[in-house]
Amino acid sequence: MPRSTKKGPFFDHHLIKKVESAAGSKRPIKTCSRRSVILPQMVGHTIAIHNGKNYHPVVINENMVGHKLGEFSITRVFKGHGGDKKSGK
């Protein structure tokens, strides 16, 4: 179920403060807040999103506005299905 429109988008205030203070800077902004919605103020910034193990840098563009940060940093690594053990030798 999507969030109610009368509540507005969710974002962590500390992340917005970091984005506003990093205006003009090329350094990525590190965050663990995967639940925050991407706002128009973030466009053009590089945000390093934590995926549980390390930080994955993502450049924010206009098409990402309205999505959540966690959508652009995957947390699971697919190693492949079983397969034939004999072909590996």
From Swiss-Prot:
Entry's transmembrane regions: none
GO molecular function: rRNA binding; structural constituent of ribosome
One cellular component term from this protein's GO annotations in UniProt: small ribosomal subunit
PROSITE patterns documented for this protein: RIBOSOMAL_S19
A Pfam family this chain is assigned to: Ribosomal_S19
Signal peptide: none
Highest taxon above the source species: Bacteria
Keyword annotations from UniProtKB, A to Z: Ribonucleoprotein, Ribosomal protein, RNA-binding, rRNA-binding
Job of this protein: Protein S19 forms a complex with S13 that binds strongly to the 16S ribosomal RNA.
This protein's name: Small ribosomal subunit protein uS19
Taxonomic source organism: Xylella fastidiosa (strain M12)
Gene: rpsS
